[in-house]
């Protein structure tokens, strides 16, 4: 039997779990693990410049691949710096395992140097936290951590490791468990047959049905089953911000994103529907607006693997607890047996109404402006990448422009902080994606506010040769804050103008990368093409685009209104 120290057990456990990359930053409490990483080998470690970025990188990897991202940080400030990244992953149900160092067990509770209660601090934003107290427990705890992170509704798991249990002088037998189970945790994956049959019958009988798809559909990997179901029943589809890509955006039945900045046709279809078939969604406030006015005539069918998400905000008339992929497979089997296809004549009038809403062309903008419109930047990017890039974003107007003007036809291509809305997410997430998928085109869409939250990771990108394209929509404002101030606060721009911005091109060059400035509309196509060519030649390129600072994101739902109440421009509302 192999004899290993606690630190060596950590590394061997990661290897036995199939982990290839770890993102982290060393410190006193985890130096034994870092020494084991060096001596044992087998794992690529990415040395970040800030622990928050380490978590975002692991998060980006997890979103793009479906694998569990792994982070290693030291105790005290190393652990607390990771919290924002952990909370970001928690809100979006992303599987992570975060290994945090801790002071020796004999010092816990005595305010030792770099001590903090990581289990207590992280508890509200993790799926589970472990404090490992004995060296021999390390393999079993890590096996449980990965299983918890990836199963059911995924999420981050923290494993807190006191320094003394990692002692390289203390060797114990290493046994990697073949399987793991937890008596109090057994997520339901197969849907109830009776409920599925009721849901299908309700869908077939509907006159104004709509399918509402969220991030849970991407997690479940049900895009093919979803497409087959939707096409068989001729159903219109809307997606949440997190669900973009679960159903092809260029498909004729796709109506785009719904919610606060959703398309006119998506929001109107939701509001007027008589049946809503919700797949892997939370019905969060950014998609419902005023619950008292929400979809007043709709029967709600809701599939979700997390029973606590069903009827939490919107009551489900037919709840189905289970994995979305398995439930849709069950539904397709039932559909084939009963041949219960939606007669086209039954919802022809509904589709005619939807096409009238679609004809409103809610995403049109001024294409002849002398200033660069942010919408044009995203559309050009989509065209030049043939819609096949992995796109990460930060948070703000640029995030909404990317969501609306870059149609995603594949899952896991759109990577953003939807729930927590974390500025500074985009760049490190892009680096995590590129680390996992080196042959793919990876683009970070950001803004002059967000990019400065984690811009130090340009150094990490250089060290590990991670050629991504960074597109900075520079409007010299905190754009979304300014938009709200324009619309709600009578144009009082309190602390939303970004003074003393750096020269981003020269800053990128100082970090060892290529910087490109775009200031005029006629430069957009050629310089973005040049940037993508440089990326293909293994260079990170930072493109600073001077965009129209007065531009707003539309549509925008009216605060306190129903799904059908929107601003379509600065002067037009429904």
UniProtKB/Swiss-Prot annotation:
Cofactor: Mg(2+); thiamine diphosphate
InterPro entries, sorted: Acetolactate_synth_lsu (IPR012846), AHAS_TPP (IPR039368), DHS-like_NAD/FAD-binding_dom (IPR029035), THDP-binding (IPR029061), Thiamin_PyroP_enz_cen_dom (IPR012000), Thiamin_PyroP_enz_TPP-bd_dom (IPR012001), TPP-bd_CS (IPR000399), TPP_enz (IPR045229)
Molecular function terms from GO: acetolactate synthase activity; flavin adenine dinucleotide binding; magnesium ion binding; thiamine pyrophosphate binding
Annotated Mg(2+) binding sites: 448, 475
Entry's cofactor comment: Binds 1 Mg(2+) ion per subunit.
UniProt activity-regulation remark: Sensitive to valine inhibition.
Annotated catalysed reactions: 2 pyruvate + H(+) = (2S)-2-acetolactate + CO2
TM annotation in the entry: none
EC number: 2.2.1.6
Keywords from the UniProt entry: Amino-acid biosynthesis, Branched-chain amino acid biosynthesis, FAD, Flavoprotein, Magnesium, Metal-binding, Thiamine pyrophosphate, Transferase
Binding site for FAD: 153, 261-282, 304-323
Pfam families: TPP_enzyme_C (PF02775), TPP_enzyme_M (PF00205), TPP_enzyme_N (PF02776)
SUPFAM superfamilies registered for this protein in UniProt: DHS-like NAD/FAD-binding domain, Thiamin diphosphate-binding fold (THDP-binding)
Gene Ontology BP, a term: L-valine biosynthetic process
One GO cellular component term noted in the UniProt record for this chain: acetolactate synthase complex
Subunit structure: Dimer of large and small chains.
This protein's name: Acetolactate synthase isozyme 3 large subunit
Protein source organism: Escherichia coli (strain K12)
Lineage: Bacteria, Pseudomonadati, Pseudomonadota, Gammaproteobacteria, Enterobacterales
């Amino acid at each position: 039997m192999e004899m290993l120290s606690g630190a060596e057990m950590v590394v061997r456990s990661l290897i036995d779990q199939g982990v290839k990359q770890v993102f982290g930053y060393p410190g006193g409490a985890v130096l034994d693990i870092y020494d084991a990483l060096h001596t044992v080998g087998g794992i690529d470690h990415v040395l970040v410049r800030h622990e928050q970025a380490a978590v975002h990188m692991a998060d980006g990897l997890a979103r793009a691949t479906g694998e569990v991202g792994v982070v290693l940080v030291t105790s005290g400030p190393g652990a607390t710096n990771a919290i924002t990244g952990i909370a970001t992953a928690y809100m979006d149900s992303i599987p992570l395992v975060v290994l945090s160092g801790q002071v020796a067990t004999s010092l816990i509770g005595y305010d030792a140097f770099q001590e903090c209660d990581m289990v207590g601090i992280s508890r509200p934003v993790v799926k589970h936290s472990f404090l490992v107290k004995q060296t021999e427990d390390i393999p079993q705890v890590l096996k449980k951590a990965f299983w918890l992170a990836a199963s059911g509704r995924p999420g981050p798991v923290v494993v807190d490791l006191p320094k003394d249990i990692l002692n390289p002088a203390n060797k114990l037998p290493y046994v990697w468990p073949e399987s793991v189970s937890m008596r109090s945790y057994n997520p339901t994956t197969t849907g109830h047959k009776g409920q599925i049959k009721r849901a299908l019958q309700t869908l077939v009988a509907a006159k104004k049905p709509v399918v509402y798809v969220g991030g849970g559909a991407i997690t479940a990997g049900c895009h093919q089953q979803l497409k087959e179901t939707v096409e068989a029943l001729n159903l219109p589809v809307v997606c949440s911000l997190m669900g973009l890509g679960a159903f092809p955006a260029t498909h004729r039945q796709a109506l785009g994103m719904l919610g606060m900045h959703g398309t006119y046709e998506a929001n109107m279809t939701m509001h007027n529907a008589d049946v809503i078939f919700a797949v892997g969604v939370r019905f969060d406030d950014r998609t419902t607006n005023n619950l008292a006015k929400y979809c007043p005539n709709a029967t709600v069918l809701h599939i979700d693997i997390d029973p606590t998400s069903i009827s939490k905000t919107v009551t489900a008339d037919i709840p189905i607890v289970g994995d979305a992929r398995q439930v849709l497979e069950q539904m397709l089997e039932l559909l084939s047996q009963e041949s219960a296809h939606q007669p086209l004549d039954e919802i022809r009038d509904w589709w005619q109404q939807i096409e009238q809403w679609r004809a409103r062309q809610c995403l049109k903008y001024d294409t002849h402006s002398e200033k660069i419109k942010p919408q044009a930047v995203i559309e050009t990017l989509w065209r030049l990448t043939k819609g096949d890039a992995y796109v990460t974003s930060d948070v703000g107007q640029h995030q909404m422009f990317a969501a609306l003007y870059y149609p995603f036809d594949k899952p896991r291509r759109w990577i953003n902080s939807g729930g927590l809305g974390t500025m500074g997410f985009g760049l490190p997430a892009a680096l995590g994606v590129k680390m996992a998928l080196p042959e793919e085109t990876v683009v970070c869409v950001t803004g002059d506010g967000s990019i400065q939250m984690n811009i130090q990771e340009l150094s990490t990108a250089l060290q590990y040769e991670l050629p991504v394209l960074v597109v900075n929509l520079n409007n010299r404002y905190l754009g979304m804050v300014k938009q709200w101030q324009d619309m709600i606060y009578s144009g009082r721009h309190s602390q939303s103008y970004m003074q003393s911005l750096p020269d981003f091109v020269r800053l990128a060059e100082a970090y060892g990368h290529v910087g490109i400035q775009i200031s005029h509309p006629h430069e957009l196509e050629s310089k973005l093409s040049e940037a993508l060519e440089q990326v293909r030649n293994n260079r990170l390129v930072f493109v600073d685009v001077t965009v129209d600072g007065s531009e707003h994101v539309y549509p925008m739902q009216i605060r306190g209104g129903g799904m059908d109440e929107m601003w379509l421009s600065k002067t037009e509302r429904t």
